[in-house]
Amino acid sequence: MKLKKFAALLLAAVMTLSMAACTKEEGQAGGGEKEEEKDQLVLGTSADFAPYEFHKMVDGKDTILGFDVALAKKIAEEMDKELVIKDMDFNSLLNELNNGSVDFVAAGLSPDEERKKQVDFSDPYYFGEQCCIIRKEDAEKYTSLESFKDQQIAAQTGSIQEGIAKEQFPGSVLVSLPKLPDEIMSLSSGKVEGVIVEVAVANGFIAQNPDLMIADFEVPYDATGSCIAVKKGNTELLDHINSVIADVVASGEMDEMVNQANLDSEY
């Protein structure tokens, strides 16, 4: 009797282990799906960067718009996928890409050397100039890069603008903030004296904040253009993305996306 019970328990244990092994193999197979086998394409972005990506109420629903989003939709459409958008802090985007939470990142990214160590980049799809936003009342006070010496100047955490602040604004004090609206609020309230941002983005914030303006001096920047990021080694997806970028840039559709995003970002 005891022998029968032992045999039954042993058989149950073997079956449990076998089922666990099968489950593990199925899970691994699902995680290793090729791009063409997946039904969805997941975009990681930080939707506080109009006209690239931003929130807007459309027909009573909070919607993420922008030309990065329009380009991502085009990529998903060409790959016959459903686009899923994940909105997160800019500084966490590349980490989320590398841990597999998203398939690609479009967020006005420029491929600097540090980022190139972490991810692979597409061909550029848009080139923009950098500027410094100041309060209108300070127009005569801040007339050059050097005039910000010993003054606090804001840039988004993890952005190219952080590097610009350190390299081009000698003696200034960098204040890194996670969200651009926080930077604009800090500028309007007098907590910082300037905000470094791309011109197209600056125009959107200035339209909503008439007390602000773009400072009347150039911000030097070696433009590498905005690119899409994918996980290192994901050449399959990168090839799809570069093919779409080449088509929309050559056809002028990219310009149409930018123009539409500028219109959509006007409140």
Predicted regions and their residues:
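Periplasmic-binding protein-like
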Residues: 47, 127-134, 199, 203-245, ...
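Flexible hinge/capping segments at coil-to-helix
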Residues: 30-31, 135-153
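Short, low-complexity disordered leader/linker segments with a strong preference
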Residues: 1-40, 266-267
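Extracytoplasmic small-molecule ligand-binding "clamshell" domains
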Residues: 32-109
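Short loop->beta-strand "edge-of-pocket" segments that line small-molecule binding or catalytic clefts
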Residues: 42-45, 145-158, 173
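Ligand-binding clefts/hinges and TM-proximal coupling segments of bilobed small-molecule sensing domains
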Residues: 25-31, 82, 160-175, 213-218, ...
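Extended ligand-binding regions for polar small-molecule ligands
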Residues: 24-25, 69-78, 136, 152, ...
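A ligand-binding cleft/hinge motif common to bilobed small-molecule-binding domains
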Residues: 91-92, 109-118, 164-167, 188-189, ...
